[in-house]
A protein has these predicted regions:
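Extracellular/lumenal glycan-associated surfaces
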Residues: 38, 210, 256
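A generic structural micro-environment signature
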Residues: 28-29, 43, 70, 89, ...
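Vicinal oxygen chelate
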Residues: 1-11, 15-24, 52-53, 68-92, 94-148, 170-190, 196-201, ...
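Short, flexible domain-boundary/linker segments around small modular repeats
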Residues: 58-65, 193-194
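Core segments of cupin and vicinal oxygen chelate
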Residues: 6, 11-59, 95, 103-111, ...
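Generic N-terminal helix/loop capping motif
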Residues: 36-43, 67, 83-86
């Protein structure tokens, strides 16, 4: 069994702190992401409801769960935002036009989680930390480096994020193109990107969060991902948050690889 290192970065309120993957074929997904990012897997037990975590150099960096058989749920990566008391976040989400899906769920002593939809329909989670405040690594190859929220309801979602999580936004829109902004947590640090899905996008693309995992060089990382069976959606591109590419994994789950711009 891999050793577990629970030393993690300090995540302020409202910051993306964890991601997990919901898929039908867990074993296939584990093989894909192990080969791509070098992850090892720590199997869950009864106390965590079978929740399995990906480890990188002993640090927890992501989770994985199996979809219920026949459930009408897309395979997807979920971004979790850090909160204090999850019941307070639950009330705020519903009060500001979002919708919580079910009740808070404990993952043993690690954390309590809650899944919700924002007013634009994007699926996300909130994370009340216990023994696990979040991902043990950031910006290292194979670990989470950035998150982006894409929405068709830009103004309402921006107001929702401000009301629930206190996020302030710096507008980054250029030359009359689709609106986008950088969200900041209360400490002033950048937390994630917010981008508008405008009429140029295909209508079938839903609002969603995209988790980006760090790499040192996007070209060989992309080639490796494609060789493992990923599908290229967009890129490579030189974007506002680094050089990256958007991909879909074995079950169509969307994620990004990114050489982060840490300047």
């Amino acid at each position: 069994m891999p050793d577990l290192n629970l030393t993690v970065p300090d995540y302020p309120y409202g910051a993306p702190c964890w991601v997990d993957l919901l898929v039908g074929d867990v074993e296939r997904a584990q093989s894909f992401y192990s080969d791509l990012f070098g992850w090892r897997w720590l199997a869950g037990d009864a106390a965590t409801g079978g929740y399995t975590m990906a480890l990188l150099d002993g640090h927890p960096v992501a989770g994985i769960s199996r979809k219920p058989v026949g459930a009408p749920i897309a395979s997807q990566w979920t971004t979790y935002l850090r909160v204090g008391q999850i019941e307070v976040a639950e009330a705020a989400i519903n009060a500001h036009g979002g919708r919580t899906l079910g009740r808070p769920v404990p993952i043993g002593a690690l954390a309590r989680t809650l899944i919700a939809l924002d007013p634009g329909g994007a699926y996300f989670g909130v994370w009340e930390p216990g023994d696990l405040p979040g991902s043990g690594l950031l910006d290292e190859p194979g670990s989470l480096t950035w998150n982006e929220l894409l929405t068709r309801d830009y103004d309402r979602v921006q107001s929702f994020q401000l009301g629930v999580f206190g996020h302030e936004f710096t507008d980054e829109t250029e030359n009359g193109g689709p609106r986008w902004a950088t969200a900041h947590t209360g400490d002033g640090n950048p937390a994630y990107g917010l981008a508008e899905i405008d009429d140029e996008w295909p209508r079938e693309i839903p609002p969603h969060w995209v988790a980006s995992f760090a790499t040192n060089n996007v070209v060989p990382a992309l080639a490796k991902a494609l060789d493992l069976g990923a599908t290229l959606i967009q890129g490579p591109f030189d974007g506002p948050y680094g050089v990256g590419a958007v991909l879909s994994g074995p079950e169509g789950e969307v994620f990004s690889i990114l050489v982060p711009d840490l300047d």
